Amino acid sequence: MRCLPVFIILLLLIPSAPSVDAQPKTEDDVPLASLHDNAKLTLQGLWDKRCCPNLFYCCPDRRK
């Protein structure tokens, strides 16, 4: 029964603990949107390298 008050105090302190979002941003922090854009550009570049100039059906952007 001695542990019960300690357990209750710990439960009360958990919601008041600072969250991850409360930490100040550093110069190394990168927003997730830019990571998504970088991945999209990389995949698009790899897709373009796969396509040959004479195979227009494999490149949706090069259909003309």
From Swiss-Prot:
Which residues are part of the propeptide segment?
23-48
Cite the entry's keywords alphabetically.
Cleavage on pair of basic residues, Disulfide bond, Secreted, Signal, Toxin
Main localization category: secreted
Q: Where in the cell is it found?
A: Secreted
The free-text tissue note of the record is: Expressed by the venom duct.
User: What processing steps or modifications follow its translation?
Assistant: Contains 2 disulfide bonds that can be either 'C1-C3, C2-C4' or 'C1-C4, C2-C3', since these disulfide connectivities have been observed for conotoxins with cysteine framework V (for examples, see AC P0DQQ7 and AC P81755).
Q: What GO terms are given for molecular function?
A: toxin activity
Among the entry's GO cellular component annotations, what is one?
A: extracellular region
Which protein family is named in the record? Belongs to the conotoxin T superfamily.
Q: What is this protein called?
A: Conotoxin Leo-T1
Q: Which organism is it from?
A: Conus leopardus
